[in-house]
């Protein structure tokens, strides 16, 4: 190996060491989704990143999505997906598929991925230990094309009511990395489909996490010229939404980050999961690769 390459590797370690020391014993909640869950190289890199985090004393908690996988199984079963304002309408049949795919398939695939790469992971859904307590979402449809706001019944779509931390606390005290499926449970045992970003944000608050990290399929928050915005604060969120800089699916992600920050999470990151080792590049380098809200 050329001496220059060896020197560069040493520089990387020197840059990372202060961050490793600073974050030892801290909890990071990571929303895992998008292309990082599909591409084989990215999947391996993600597993290696969270294992390294655990080995240097960071406590990662993974919350995952699974929209494309749900859509694929629904298609095979002859069920037609329906969305309103970007939210999946979840009737009884759809809820059965959602729970089966998220808790039974996607969750265990991620657990297996981490274990095969040398880590120790265990999966759970929000039903386990009554971890994600939920209520039915009341969705009000409004916008430029809606003259009179109307309440829409989305079926078994829920919002987080409360996070019970007992199981997650036990994982944190061990070497096991928890992998959480965003399926919640209601007061009467109802099953709810909940947005994974929202679940991650609420878990970050409940676990008093140092960081919330959302993996996406874009570089982060971008200005109107497509240039990455490296850092924002709470007051920037409404401005970016009002002036149209942030649109579509980035809006709820930013709102989740703001809610987490208000709830005591020190920093929330939106990063590009299409970049190999995106997690390590964001948390162990001076420049990072995405957008951080502090």
From Swiss-Prot:
Coiled coil: none annotated. The record marks 31, 253 as: Transition state stabilizer. One of its GO terms (cellular component) is cytoplasm. The keyword Ligase does not apply. The keyword Phosphoprotein does not apply. Belongs to the acetylglutamate kinase family. ArgB subfamily. This is Acetylglutamate kinase. It comes from Magnetococcus marinus (strain ATCC BAA-1437 / JCM 17883 / MC-1). The lineage of its organism: Bacteria, Pseudomonadati, Pseudomonadota, Alphaproteobacteria, Magnetococcales.
């Amino acid at each position: 190996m050329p001496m220059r390459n060896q020197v560069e590797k040493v520089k990387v370690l020197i840059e990372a060491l202060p961050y490793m020391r600073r974050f030892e014993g801290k909890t990071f909640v990571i929303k895992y989704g998008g292309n990082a869950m599909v591409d084989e190289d990215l999947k391996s890199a993600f597993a290696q990143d969270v294992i390294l985090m655990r080995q240097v004393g960071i406590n990662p908690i993974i919350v995952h999505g699974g929209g494309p996988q749900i859509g694929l199984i629904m298609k095979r079963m002859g069920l037609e997906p329906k969305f309103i304002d970007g939210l999946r309408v979840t009737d009884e049949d759809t809820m059965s598929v959602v729970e089966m795919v998220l808790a039974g398939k996607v969750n265990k695939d991620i657990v297996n991925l981490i274990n095969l790469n040398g880590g120790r992971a265990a999966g759970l859904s929000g039903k386990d230990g009554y971890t994600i307590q939920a209520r039915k979402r009341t969705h009000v449809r409004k916008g430029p094309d809606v003259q009179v706001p109307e309440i829409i019944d989305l079926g078994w779509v829920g919002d987080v009511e409360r996070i019970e931390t007992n199981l997650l606390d036990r994982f944190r005290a061990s070497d096991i990395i928890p992998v959480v499926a965003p399926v919640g449970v209601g007061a009467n045992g109802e099953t709810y489909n909940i947005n994974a970003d929202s679940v991650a944000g609420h878990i970050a608050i409940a676990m008093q996490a140092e960081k919330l990290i959302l993996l996406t399929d874009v570089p982060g928050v971008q200005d109107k010229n497509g240039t990455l915005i490296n850092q924002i604060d709470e007051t920037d969120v409404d401005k970016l939404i009002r002036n149209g800089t942030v649109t579509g699916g980035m809006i709820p992600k930013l709102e989740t980050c703001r809610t987490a920050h208000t709830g005591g999470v020190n920093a929330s990151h939106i990063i590009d999961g299409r970049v190999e080792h995106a997690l390590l590049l964001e948390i162990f380098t001076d420049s990072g690769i995405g957008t951080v809200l502090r």
